Each structure stands twice: as C-alpha cells, then as structure tokens.
C-alpha cells in the first residue's frame, strides 16, 4: 500500500519477500535507509500509475488514473528509477501496476502494459540490468448478478502476447476473482415492518458485517435459504442505528418471515476483512465448507473478546 511503516518494511525484508512495490520517492528513501541498517539489498519494483481510466462500478475502485494516491506518476517514473539505480541498498528488479477493480474488458490492461514496457525499455536504456518482474495487479471482474465474468483464458493470451517478447516474468494478483463468489453471508430475519409505504425485512446482519452495499452501493444477490413460493419487494436492512445500514434496497426477494435464514451471495471478498465492531456489534463466525464437510475457522466474537 501507499503508507508502509518502518516496521512493515523491516518485516518484509527480514521475511525475504520477492519484492517491495514502491509507491513514491519518499518510500524509496525509507526502504534504502532501512535496508542499509539491516545490511541488506532490498528487491524493488516501482509501482507505476499508468494513467489508465477504467470503467469500474464505483470511482473508489479506480486506482490507476492520474490524481489518485496510488503509484508513481507515469511521467516521473524514469527519474525515480534513475535514483533507485544509484542506491547501494536497492535492487531494482521490476515494475508494477494495479489499475482498478471489477474490470470486465482487456483494454485497460493492454494500455497499462504497453506503458510499463515502454518504461522498462527507457529504464534499461538508463543503465539498469534486465528488469525481471512485471506485476500487473488484479482487478479481474467476478459476477455479482448477471454480469459475464472476464474470460481468463483470453485475458491470459492478451497478456502473453504483449509480455512474452520482453522475457519478463508476469505476476498477477487475482484476489477477488478467486474468492468473491466462494463466500455467503448467512443472516436471520428478525422482523418484518412496513413504514411510509415501504416494506422492510430487518435481519441480524448489518453494515458492520458487510459494508460493501453501504460503502460502494454494491449489489449482492439475496435469497431465502428455503425458497418461498411467494415473492415480495422490500429493503433488506440491519440493526445498526443509521439509515445507511442496508444489504439491499427495493429488492424482489423470497417472502421470508421472522426466524427464516437469508443468504447474501458473493460475500467472499471484501466482506469479513472489512467488518468492524461499529455500534458495539460483535463480528460473525466464519465457517469453511468443503465437499460436504464443514468446520469453524473463526469463532464468533463475544463481548468478552
């Protein structure tokens, strides 16, 4: 991330990470200083902001366009690279980018990769040894509703055709793509309520458990665990004391009753890890299900905890 601390840098170098993705000149200076004190040579990739506009579901998930906090501006990267090459405790081995999240087409990657390879050639022309690693980040889209997920094989072919002639090793970070659809938030209906001509289904999970709908206006499919023959249109809301506490608004859902279980789908990414104790609420348990077997991997939090 853009805010690495001294301690985090020490831990990374002591652990022997493949490389540290440097986001700014100041961070490069810190890394050089820490590596010198440890008697190490820090492996570094420069995270480049390639200034690629991406059509993402929410502007918060655009990370590779000019004016964002992420990465070194494209037109400043060569100068930063030249500084890195002159540092005794820095080994510049690669370049890195991450242009956004929920990307469903190839063009942003093609543009970004083209700019990184241009930089690679300029940096090597400035005296660098052959750069080895090209980290293209993540951001591959998954299907939350009826969207078509990105074609991974076709994506791989696009990347291969661009990168293969350079001889660089490609690193991909497909976090959400791997786990997004693997998680389900299970919640129980507490009450049904009608107010102002609207129907509300009040459940025992709230924005502190899954903040994506409130924070990003993100869509998650919501279904009764036991399907109902009847349907209703309702807001599915939680117990937190603000109007932004919802899991879905104006949804056509199963006509569930108090005590029924409801499944909020595609909650495997940016779900539990973004949960909090807001409103003095305890965090949920996590249960791993595999081939008909299950086990608790994170115990339900208690007030004593």
What spans do the regions from the language model cover?
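Active-site-proximal beta-alpha core segment in soluble small-molecule metabolic enzymes
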Residues: 1-133, 142, 158
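Conserved beta-strand positions
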Residues: 22, 97, 136, 172-174, ...
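Catalytic core of soluble alpha/beta enzymes
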Residues: 52-56, 153, 179-180
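Short glycine/threonine-rich loop-to-helix capping motif typified by GTGT followed
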Residues: 105-112, 143-155, 181-191, 249-252
